[in-house]
Amino acid sequence: MSKGIHWVRNDQRLSDNPALSKALSECEEVLLVYAFDDRIWQPGRIGPYRAKFILQSLDSLRQGVESLGGVLTFVHGRASGEIPQLMRSWGAERCYGQREDAWEETEEEKALGREVDLRLTEGKGLLEEEDLPFSLADMPGVFSPFRRKVEKNLTIRPELP
């Protein structure tokens, strides 16, 4: 039986979540994991309003996961240190997550990817590169021509389960 871990980060949705959908389609069992990274969760680094918002979002996600019979697991520390240990103890073969763009997040992806089979997906934007009717090199430099080309050729992707 194949097992995988879905690394919960900034995309805390159960529906229309490309990384979670990929994990569920490739694994028979998926454990959702959120890492409270001490480098981020410290005074002065994260404000009280942002912290409250994230905690409320995680609680909502936890309730949604539990309503489906699953578990949202929380670990304390860097994902690159905690997730490999959890994968070994649970017998998971792969880790899935959404690709991030910020420097610290991409460094953490690289560190985790050196330890486990990490499969990252896009999914933060309304459009992905392959949806564009032109290459990035040929992208219009002004919004109006961009919008006209995209609107003329746009096929809206169906929502993921």
Q: Which ranges hold each PLM region?
A:
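Trp/Phe/Arg-rich N-terminal binding region typifying the photolyase-homology
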Residues: M1-P158
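Surface-exposed loop/turn segments and immediately adjacent short secondary-structure elements
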Residues: P161
